């Protein structure tokens, strides 16, 4: 519940228990691997799927799926999604929203690379959004920025992500896991003169060793659509903040 409190207090998104995104980590393909690691950009990679808290610390990572798997397929096969679908992820019970009578599920915020489901919220399509939809998409995108920020800090702190990693993929997995653990440690440990401090930087567009997930058409569930509409109504009514319309 501490994660949800963080998103509510810092990013004005109640009942949010994380922000999810993924990156292709570029590698040099092993001999005789063929197109096994070949991704949508024509390079070779493994995928890092991660969830962050409101402070841009990683609270879940899944790394190692080969880049050939579609990005939707990576989410489908990752352990977190499988536990959510099976009801074994330990999701909190639905909770009443602040200053409201609406009882809604806890959710993870995502972007267009992910499906819309009861516990996975994504923005509305960018085409022909009305004001209420734009407000929802803005509020969600603010909260989701935390995971982009986490990736940006990770990539800028560890230069191993600045080019394709020329090691066996099993070793790359261990390196990525170690870097995410060190990222969390350095985010929470007292700064010392021997530890370089890296400013928050959510820009991963110019990191040569990382690629974003490919946006592809994802199926929306009926429950996901209903929950998103209820959050939209909340953000435009009792959950509105005075400055939100300036950004829509």
Regions found by a protein language model. Give the residues of each.
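Short, polybasic Lys/Arg-rich linear motifs in disordered N-terminal/cytosolic regions
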Residues: 1-248
């Amino acid at each position: 519940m501490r994660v949800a409190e963080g998103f509510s207090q810092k990013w004005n998104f109640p009942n949010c228990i994380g922000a999810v995104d993924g990156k292709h980590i570029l590698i040099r393909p092993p001999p005789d691997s063929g197109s096994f690691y070949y991704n949508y950009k024509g390079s070779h990679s493994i995928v890092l799927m991660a969830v962050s808290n409101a402070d841009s610390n990683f609270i879940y990572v899944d790394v190692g799926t080969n880049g050939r798997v579609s990005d939707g397929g990576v989410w489908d096969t990752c352990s977190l999604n499988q536990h959510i679908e099976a009801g074994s992820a330990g999701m909190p019970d639905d909770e009443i929203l602040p200053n409201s009578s609406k009882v809604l599920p806890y959710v993870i915020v995502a972007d267009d690379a992910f499906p819309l489901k009861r516990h996975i919220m994504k923005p509305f399509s960018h085409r022909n959004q009305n004001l209420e939809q734009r407000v929802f998409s803005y509020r969600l995108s603010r909260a989701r920025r935390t995971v982009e920020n986490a990736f940006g800090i990770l990539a800028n702190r560890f230069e191993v992500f600045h080019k394709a990693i020329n090691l066996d993929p099993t070793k790359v997995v261990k390196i990525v896991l170690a870097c995410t653990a060190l990222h969390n440690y350095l985010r929470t440990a007292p700064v010392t003169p021997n530890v370089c401090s890296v400013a928050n930087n959510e820009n991963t567009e110019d990191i040569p060793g990382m690629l974003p997930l490919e946006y592809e058409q994802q199926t929306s569930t009926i429950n996901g659509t209903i929950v998103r509409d209820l959050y939209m109504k909340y953000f435009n009514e009792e959950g509105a903040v005075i400055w939100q319309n300036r950004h829509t």
